[in-house]
Amino acid sequence: MLGRDVPGRPVLGRELKRRNLLLGAAATAATGGALAGVAAFSTSRAPATALQKDLLSRDPKASKAARSVYRLLAGLEADARAGRRRGTLVGQHAEVHNERYNPEYGDHTGPKPPGYYYRKPQDITGKLPAFLELDLGPGYQQESWGVGEARDYSRAAWPARREFWTYTNDVVDLAMGVWHGLPRKDDGSYNPTGTETLWNGTKTVLPANGGAPAGLVGMSFHQPWPGSPVKSYEQTLRRSAPSAKDPGWIDRVLTPGSAEHAALLLDLSFLADHLGYLAAYDVPVLLRPYHEMNSIGGEQSFWWAGLKPQQYTALWELLYHYLVGSRGLHNLIFVWAPTAWDGIHGREPWDFYPGGEYVDVVGVDDYSGTPDNPFDPAAWTSTWHRGLEDYGKPRILAESFHVPLGAAQRTTLDKAPWVLWTVWGDGLTAKNADADVQQTYDDPKTITGGRESGPAGVQWLALHDGTFE
């Protein structure tokens, strides 16, 4: 989820993201106990399955690079399940639209370059994250989708030279930079140097990472409701969508031939055009759409969190078949990530699982507690890690305000050996002491990014040619 994107207004914490839900031990007490809160939302679960080892079982045309990335994740998962944990990739989400346009966002007032929170771990620790997640949504209060400078992949469909859409160009340039390096030699791609002068005379400077492959790339999609006249965070919420008053709206969205369905496909085409550019340069993307579908935040949940399970899985399948089938995108690794099912933020998510044929990685967005006051005092985040085991997929902590290791939690990843742990945006500085960030990045089993990826690290270049084992 995202922070508010109102120009000139602060985005604080995950006030940053979730403003309506209680956090921590006080909320647990209000429900009469953590486990009781979970049990109140019991749903059905599929039987345990063996660990998926290769993308070909889901997509026979998966790119070699995407298969290599998946083998890395599956290998880390297999080792963890066997009791010989090799390491955890440390990730960072960057809210590029807020970095670029909201002067109150982040750890100081004033403008920030795109990718500010990609570089911030390096400013603190000397090391880059191994994974950068980005987002083409939700827009910054603009009418219709758009882009900054016109490019081959966007000029035919999307209005160009829109100042408050320039961040979408930054998003793909950052993704290219993490996978291929920044700055890099001219390879026919856009902005290989990381420095670009725009039509309005302003200059964009992206963070350098050594000029060589430096990590993995992900994409979430905070999609405003299909057909929304304004693209903004507010329009991603259930209270703003037609479904708040019209229970039949979502069925029309899912029905080919309807105006609502056409609006959905328009949104997905915006996503696909940008992902297609990355596919053309062989950039694998961990795509995490329609997350936190099990939220119990009511009207302040995302519009897709108000759906019945069968509607949600139909929406997921529609997106999948459009991106992979209609658009031929075989660089994608699909991530399904409910919110923590603590009975406060979310209910048990099992009925919302689209199925192994549509999902490669499972994860959780965990805002259920803090390192000082965890949901499960015995082992922070372990409840969610155990709950996802039977899907037979690599398990990731997809969103957290907090780094996994620090003064309050020194053994998190031994007890819950996630293969990837991603910190959300400015939560890195708002919710973590520098010493805790340093401890996480310095841990011998933390996999970081850049040319040097730590003792448990990865040779990023080996992922590119499909030879990684």
Residue spans for each PLM region:
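N-terminal secretory signal peptides
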Residues: 1-16, 25-34
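Aromatic-lined carbohydrate-recognition surfaces of secreted/lumenal glycan-active proteins
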Residues: 288, 324-346, 394-403
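Substrate-binding cleft of extracellular glycoside hydrolase catalytic domains
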Residues: 144-145, 150-318, 325, 329
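N-terminal module-boundary/linker segments of secreted carbohydrate-active enzymes
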Residues: 46-133, 137, 147-155
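C-terminal region of N-terminal signal peptides and the immediate post-cleavage residues
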Residues: 34-50
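Alpha-helical scaffolding within the catalytic cores
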Residues: 113-121, 271-273, 340-353, 378-385, ...
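Substrate-binding cleft of secreted/luminal carbohydrate-active enzymes
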Residues: 394-469
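Aromatic- and acid-rich polysaccharide-binding/catalytic face
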Residues: 349-372, 424
